[in-house]
């Protein structure tokens, strides 16, 4: 949402007008259809064209340029060039607090590049990759991932879990949606377990995996779940 707001401020400045107050529809349609999360898509009645901002998702070779744009976005109050570059990649559809961008792997499949923040005092991305490696070794399902370096900074590349290798979209909902809660609401593991029982096609299997992930989070000291 912040990137879409920055883009609107930049357009308003270029057009000599006051920035519009954006609503939920603006945020939904301000996302690239190519990189939109899950399987939800939008189009007008009678049209075959899906709605969303156009994007050109770059290959991994563009990581240095994308990292530079990410740093600019974090340091500048209204970095128009950085906003445009990240919008062009379809980055607006990606949630979470860490700076990131959409990229394509060598086989053409969609992935996420997670960048270090300029204010990081330790190698956050390297430790996130280490946590994923530990989970995979313990038998917990993790997305295919790789750690790469640009200069002396780590970038974590994660294959999108909501796309097949052929690009077919896989629908999903967040834990917040599953529990019917809003940002800031206090929910616990029991609430999410109940939602899994109500909504899952394979509740027994999913509850076993959910339990494994709870134990892994505790073992790793993850307090951001």
What is each model feature region?
Residues 1-223:
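Phosphate/dinucleotide-binding and metal-coordinating scaffold of catalytic cores
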